[in-house]
Amino acid sequence: MKQYAIQPATLEFNAEGTPVSRDFDDVYFSNDNGLEETRYVFLGGNRLAERFPVHSHPLFIVAESGFGTGLNFLTLWQAFDSFRSAHPQATLQRLHFISFEKFPLTRDDLALAHQHWPELAPWAEQLQAQWPLPLPGCHRLLLDRGRVTLDLWFGDINELTDQLDATLNQTVDAWFLDGFAPAKNPDMWTPNLFNAMARLARPGATLATFTSAGFVRRGLQEAGFTMQKHKGFGRKREMLCGVMEQHLMPTLSAPWFYCSGSEKRETAIIGGGIASALLSLALLRRGWQVTLYCADDQPAQGASGNRQGALYPLLSKHDAAINRFFPTAFTFARRLYDALPVSFDHAWCGVTQLGWDEKSQQKIAQMLSLALPAGLASALNAEEAEQAVGVTTRCGGITYPAGGWLCPEQLTRAVIALATEQGLQTRFRHTLTSLVAQESRWQLRFTSGETASHETVVLANGHQINRFDQTRPLPVYAVGGQVSHIPTTPALSALRQVLCYDGYLTPQNPHNQQHCIGASYHRGDESTVWREEDQRQNRQRLLDCFPDANWATEVDVSGNSARCGVRCATRDHLPMVGNVPDYHATLTHYADLADNKTSAASAPVYPGLFMLGALGSRGLCSAPLCAEILAAQMSNEPIPLDAGTLAALNPNRLWVRKLLKGKAVK
């Protein structure tokens, strides 16, 4: 089944140089002056110039139907920059733009369209640089050093708005109702869309649209907006503006997965790995006060301490949630890593996963059936695989051209150093023993006898995440593993990409002339003691998969150089991100959930206690998006994931799934 096929826009440029959609036979913007029309209709129609200086919240959220060339977004971004320059002390500090696009432009077509507006070039170039692959769902772009966030939702807007998480309800400050004309694209202009706009709009939110069609005005009025006609731009006689004056009360469709945030802006993060580091940055960007407590004497001493780690998405032959989450997480990770103003060893050399036997070949064939964009993953035959990786393989597979390897240890330490410059407080050699709720705060107790009090707490301490009374029932487990460090040779140095088989082998790091090969797997084992048997197994798995490859025999583990770590994993291979669930209250409240779904209350959680964990062996891929998701949730901001996929990350999911079926939770 072609699950992940997003059709790019097919367009041509008319005599005026304006892009025209072949699918809808309509222009993307006015032939006369598209830039001025955007300023008049959407910025003026929503009165943004007068609203920005008096906005009482640090974040202003705009939603749009039909991203197209991005003209509306770029024009708004330019205006927001001017506002920030003129009003540096204003309460409003950040802009969040949410847009939906069924047929996204290619990067090349986007760049051609942007040539129309040279004055927007400083902003257009940033957008082009981060333009995402045509994958369905939400693509979060962090622009202007995080001051501007763009959520691009690729897919049908009427389907996507039904899939949005409930935390987005009543958050939008202004709507840009754009898109091809109703007569050209009637499928978009529906009561379903108008009702979704009303559901997402906060009381007092505004909307503007270029059309004055009667059915649009009536539909928006029926949805709850107060509508008025205004003079249109240029030769257009009329346009529509509206205000949400009602206070709607949307219902929760799945309250057992509801994500609650915090009105507070102070937290303690427990941990010292890549998840803790990236979460610190994401919260600091939102104005939080953050204190990091780490049991070790420096960061990246746990699972994030390896010399080389592979970056590529996990794909599944049968799990839709994995296939929705990891490709998006991977592309977000690449954008974030590329934008970080820190240095760390890495090479985006590509990753190739080989089908060395019948079972692995079947698995890869099923992964390829997902019809992912070639920029993310594509098939290789044996000859193509050998050309890509640079060594003899005798088999084909699947390649991830944007993947590669990085040094997690360097990355983690560099990010924490960057966060410290931005206000992060760090406390090393602090081993947490217990958490005690005290009124509206959490008291932290450490092995030293020291205590600390914080308004909120995030547990991001790897395989030790279930060491506390509140988290002990979580269905997570430890996985011990050993990665071997091997010296390069002339034959091994030919390896150009990360090679994945029944293990993995990285290209050499030019700074130390070593490769990493691994990793052993010991479920339930928390030992970090070096094992000679694991060294042998790491080498033998390579030889077993490529028995005819002479280069593989040059892998030398006799130097006994290795690193042992412990990962935290779940049975369904997905992370756990969000509120820490109250296990006993969940079982009590949802004892009859299978028979009484309609009257169920929101999920029982520990107020102000959150978690980010169970990243397994793909933490480099999933940690950036997980950190962004949790920071958004904690801050009551839009979450860059659809409700179904977000539910698949909820720490209570394995219990709730059983309760929904009337099964016992053990």
Swiss-Prot record:
In the N-terminal section; belongs to the methyltransferase superfamily. tRNA (mnm(5)s(2)U34)-methyltransferase family. Its cofactor is FAD. This is tRNA 5-methylaminomethyl-2-thiouridine biosynthesis bifunctional protein MnmC. NCBIfam families: MnmC_Cterm, PRK01747.1-1, PRK01747.1-2, PRK01747.1-3, PRK01747.1-5, tRNA_MNMC2. Its main location: cytoplasm. Residues 1-245 are annotated as: tRNA (mnm(5)s(2)U34)-methyltransferase. Residues 270-666 are annotated as: FAD-dependent cmnm(5)s(2)U34 oxidoreductase. It catalyses: 5-aminomethyl-2-thiouridine(34) in tRNA + S-adenosyl-L-methionine = 5-methylaminomethyl-2-thiouridine(34) in tRNA + S-adenosyl-L-homocysteine + H(+). Keywords: Cytoplasm, FAD, Flavoprotein, Methyltransferase, Multifunctional enzyme, Oxidoreductase, S-adenosyl-L-methionine, Transferase, tRNA processing. It comes from Salmonella typhi. It is found in: Cytoplasm. The gene is mnmC. GO terms for molecular function: flavin adenine dinucleotide binding; oxidoreductase activity, acting on the CH-NH group of donors; tRNA (5-methylaminomethyl-2-thiouridylate)(34)-methyltransferase activity. GO terms for cellular component: cytoplasm. Its EC number is 2.1.1.61, 1.5.-.-. GO terms for biological process: methylation; tRNA wobble uridine modification. Pfam families: DAO, Methyltransf_30. Catalyzes the last two steps in the biosynthesis of 5-methylaminomethyl-2-thiouridine (mnm(5)s(2)U) at the wobble position (U34) in tRNA. Catalyzes the FAD-dependent demodification of cmnm(5)s(2)U34 to nm(5)s(2)U34, followed by the transfer of a methyl group from S-adenosyl-L-methionine to nm(5)s(2)U34, to form mnm(5)s(2)U34. InterPro entries: FAD-dep_OxRdtase, FAD/NAD-bd_sf, MnmC-like_methylTransf, SAM-dependent_MTases_sf, tRNA_MAMT_biosynth_bifunc_MnmC, tRNA_MNMC2, tRNA_S-uridine_synth_MnmC_C.
